[in-house]
Each structure stands twice: as C-alpha cells, then as structure tokens.
C-alpha cells in the first residue's frame, strides 16, 4: 500500500511529515489537520525526476515546490536549535501558511515561502495578514512575526505593513 511505502521512506529519512498547526481562530472554518510530507533533502526529488537547473527554470511551479521543501528543511533545523517546531496551516477555504514556527512558551511566527518578485511577495504578505486577522488573541498571543521567505534579494527588510521579507 501507499502507506507502507511512505513509512519505509520515513524510516530511511527520505521524507518527513510536517504536522498541522491548530490555532484558536475567530472563524468557524474547518482546519485541515492532515500532515504534509516533505523530502528531507530536495535534491532527492530532483535526482529522482532526472531534472536539472534548466528544467527547473522552465517549470517554476516545480521549482517553487522544491524551494519550499528546501526552506522547510532549513527552518526545521533552526527551530530545533531553539526547541521549536515547524507546522503548516491550511483551512477549508484554502487559506494556508507554509510554515509556522512555534516555541514552547507559546510564541510563534507565520511564514510564507515564495520564490520572489513583488507580486509573489505581496501575495505572501496578504496571506499572512489575513491569517493574523483571524487569530483569537483572547486565547493566544499575537504572532511574534510575519515573514515572507524568498529566493531573491540581497537584504532582509521590513515592509510598511510589518511583514518581514527575508532572502534565504
């Protein structure tokens, strides 16, 4: 079965699951609680597909998915060093957040991962602000930060709306 293959891949550290984040929200929208699977090393996916840099440049959707996997891997390493965990969020209305870093003290940050470019960065920031507006701050803290993680740019900066844009 597919599940036995997934379990085998987890045992040999090819894939890893990212659990769903379940915050207190003001809306009654159902939150999807299934795990998301990522390659531990996105180069495994590239090698198994038999593709190279030119192929990825010509297929930005695949490139974006692999970039997201790379970023999730790095975010997990950073989060583990401060005893945090990385989650993902998606609700029934398809509002999603690529990564939520959550610390034991209840603080957390919301992260959207985008290849770059103003329109994608704006889209990521809008998504983060929308999710932030739905969090019930009477039951949990405000997010410590909102961040769009990108593949482009020389410097990190803070936008006027408070969202950080950080190149990996």
Where are these predicted regions, by residue range?
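Active-site ExK catalytic segment of metal-dependent nucleases
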Residues: 102, 107-119
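Short beta-strand/turn micro-motifs composed of small residues
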Residues: 90, 148-150
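Domain-level recognition of nuclease-like catalytic cores that cleave nucleotide substrates
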Residues: 151-168
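Mg2+/Mn2+-dependent nuclease catalytic core
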Residues: 116-137
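Switch/connector loops and helix/strand junctions flanking conserved nucleotide-binding motifs
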Residues: 47, 120-122, 155-160
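Accessory nucleic acid-recognition modules appended to NTPase machines
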Residues: 1-107
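Short helix-terminating capping/connector loops at secondary-structure junctions
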Residues: 82, 138-143
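Residues at the starts of beta-strands that form the adenosine-phosphate
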Residues: 107, 144-145
């Amino acid at each position: 079965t597919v599940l036995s293959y997934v379990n085998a891949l987890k045992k040999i550290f090819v894939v890893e699951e990212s659990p769903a984040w379940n915050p207190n929200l003001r809306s009654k929208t159902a939150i999807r609680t299934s795990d998301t699977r990522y390659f531990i090393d996105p180069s495994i996916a590239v090698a198994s597909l038999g593709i190279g840099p030119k192929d990825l440049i010509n297929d930005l959707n695949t490139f974006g998915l692999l970039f997201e996997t790379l970023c999730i891997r790095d975010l997990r390493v950073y989060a583990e060093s401060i005893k945090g965990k990385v989650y993902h969020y998606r609700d029934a209305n398809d509002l999603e957040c690529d990564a939520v870093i959550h610390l034991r003290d209840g603080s957390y940050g919301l992260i959207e991962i985008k290849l770059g470019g103003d329109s994608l960065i704006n889209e990521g920031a809008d998504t983060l602000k929308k999710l932030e507006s739905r969090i019930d701050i009477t039951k949990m803290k405000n997010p410590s930060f909102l961040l769009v993680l990108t593949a482009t740019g020389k410097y990190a900066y803070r936008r006027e709306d408070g969202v950080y844009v950080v190149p990996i």
